[in-house]
């Protein structure tokens, strides 16, 4: 996300990056050849799908649990725990035919009762889940037999199939339990390809392959997540064999991962991420309640300098809530022009004028705020510095506060104890953004933590869910894109490229529209490689 750059600052940035380059010619020391170790900036918080609101928790719980549906490599919805389904002509009923002989990690059998239990849990108002609205349009869920379940909707619901991609919970293990209790969020039992072996808080999470997985035992024996809170240390761990996979920063990808050594031992990938980075405002704060102020801030930010100076070209400017890869993206919405003069004019119209110290003031109060950034995210921290300088030129003081990710998420964002934040959204392929932007989703733990409210957007978000007509949905979401371009509920900064890197001993890896992890259970390390490393 973020700001501006003078040519001098660009030089300083690149000079500091160059000094940080570390040569490496020694082969990575692989201690567990048939395990994959993944680097993560943050620890998971809760390994239950209903409660997994952060990316670390969601990614790991995705290996432990299955939904009824999932995406294939071409982003087509296919069956997961559901073998097939029938949809009524009016779209108001779905009958799911569930797979047989599916076992939970403790050996119990998966049945339709688990699906009903999951539904009843997610709609329970006492459960602090951000996903309840995905099941709000449901009238009832009925168990027809052990492996058949019927879902009836009150009205058409376009993301219905996708919504059932949420992980199903084990009734026999969680019924009558408080699923928010630390024991249950840290000791999950799923049906997925991997089961939890060990969780050392702040250090690592270890998953073992599930021998009785219904699609066949994964070929990689163990999946390990190591918590490494900064990308520089993580990159060193990658080069010396401490981890096998990480998402590179743009400087790492461009300046450090192009050596013969690196190309010999690692696969590099590059593709547009399906999400964006933004500067978010607490819209309950009176400083940000006037859209002219938000427009003015956006006009003061030079996104191209961020793309060049922070992302090194590995990204594109963001114009709204849908990335260019989305069918909901509106190509007619142009990016807001970087123009400090327009910014100053808008601030004057909103009542903010320069005082004696050269700072913007209103009613004797200077325009000053603090932006929160998560520790270890190099791109966001550098973006914050650029934003600070951009806004300084028009008379705004922006302070930067760096926080550990889980503390930032649960102590500040969930509780709305912030003025502004630099964050990112990784989006679903269906453009239903109800959970992020609808005014009903502002409670603690939900995703509209900036407290955005717009009656037209609320109506459009509901309409987008209620029609199966593709062209109608497209027009609805493109209209939302237009509204956001005017309202600037946040400053949409950039769409970063995903820059993952993986050790070359893993075979069967296929880059696809959905990324590289779609077929992970079939990745393997050839036997001769395992023997060689051992």
Which residues make up each language-model segment?
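Gly/Pro-rich hinge or "lid" segments in bacterial periplasmic/extracellular proteins
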Residues: 72-73, 164-218, 222, 232, ...
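Aromatic- and charge-enriched surface segment that lines or borders ligand/interaction sites
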Residues: 83-128, 150, 234-237, 287
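Ligand-site clamp/hinge motif
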Residues: 182-185, 210-256, 388, 397-399, ...
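Detector for C-terminal structural segments
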Residues: 200, 277, 300-334, 379-388, ...
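Structural transition elements
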Residues: 282, 289, 317-355, 375-382
């Amino acid at each position: 996300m973020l700001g501006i750059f003078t040519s001098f600052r660009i030089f300083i940035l690149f000079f500091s990056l160059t000094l940080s380059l570390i040569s490496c010619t020694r082969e990575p020391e692989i201690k567990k050849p048939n395990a994959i170790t993944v680097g993560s900036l943050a620890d998971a918080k809760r390994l239950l799908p209903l409660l997994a609101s952060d990316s670390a928790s969601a990614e790991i719980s995705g290996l432990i649990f299955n939904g009824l549906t999932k995406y294939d490599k071409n982003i087509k919805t296919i069956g997961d725990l559901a073998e097939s389904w029938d949809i009524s002509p009016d779209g108001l009923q779905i009958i799911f035919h569930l797979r047989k002989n599916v076992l939970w990690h403790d050996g119990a059998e998966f049945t339709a009762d688990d699906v009903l239990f999951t539904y009843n849990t997610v709609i329970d108002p006492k459960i602090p889940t951000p996903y309840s609205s995905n099941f709000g349009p449901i009238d009832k869920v009925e168990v027809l037999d052990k492996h058949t379940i019927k879902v009836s909707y009150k009205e058409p619901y376009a993301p219905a199939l996708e919504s059932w991609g949420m992980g199903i919970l084990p009734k026999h293990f969680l019924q009558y339990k408080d699923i928010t209790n630390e024991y249950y969020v840290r000791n999950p039992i799923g049906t997925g390809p991997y089961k939890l072996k060990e969780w050392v808080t702040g250090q690592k999470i270890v998953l073992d392959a599930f021998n009785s997985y219904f699609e066949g035992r994964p070929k990689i024996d163990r999946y390990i997540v190591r918590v490494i809170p900064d990308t520089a240390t993580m990159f060193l761990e990658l080069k010396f064999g401490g981890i096998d996979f990480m998402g590179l920063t743009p400087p790492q990808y461009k300046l450090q991962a192009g050596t013969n050594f690196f190309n010999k031992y690692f696969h590099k990938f590059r593709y547009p991420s399906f999400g964006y980075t933004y500067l978010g405002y607490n819209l309950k704060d009176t400083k940000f309640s006037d859209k002219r102020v938000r427009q003015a801030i956006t006009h003061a930010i030079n996104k191209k300098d961020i793309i060049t100076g922070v992302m090194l070209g590995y990204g594109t400017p963001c114009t709204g809530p849908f990335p260019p890869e989305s069918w909901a993206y509106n190509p007619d919405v142009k990016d807001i022009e970087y123009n400090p003069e327009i910014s100053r004019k808008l601030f004057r119209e909103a009542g903010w004028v320069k005082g004696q110290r050269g700072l913007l003031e209103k009613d004797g109060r200077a325009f000053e705020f603090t932006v929160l950034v998560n520790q270890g995210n190099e791109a966001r921290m550098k973006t914050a510095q650029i934003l600070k300088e951009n806004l300084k030129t028009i008379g705004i003081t922006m302070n930067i506060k760096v926080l550990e990710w889980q503390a930032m998420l649960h102590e500040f964002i969930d509780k709305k104890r912030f003025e502004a934040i630099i964050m990112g959204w990784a989006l679903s392929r269906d453009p239903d953004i109800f959970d992020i932007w609808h005014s009903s989703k502002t409670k603690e733990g939900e995703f509209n933590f900036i407290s955005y409210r717009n009656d037209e957007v609320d109506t459009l978000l509901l309409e987008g869910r209620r029609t199966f007509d593709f062209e109608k949905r497209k027009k609805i979401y493109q209209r939302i894109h237009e509204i956001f371009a005017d309202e600037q509920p946040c400053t949409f900064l950039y769409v970063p490229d995903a820059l993952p890197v993986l050790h070359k001993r893993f075979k069967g890896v296929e880059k696809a529209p959905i990324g590289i992890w779609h077929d992970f259970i079939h990745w393997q390390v050839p036997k001769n490689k395992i023997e060689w490393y051992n």
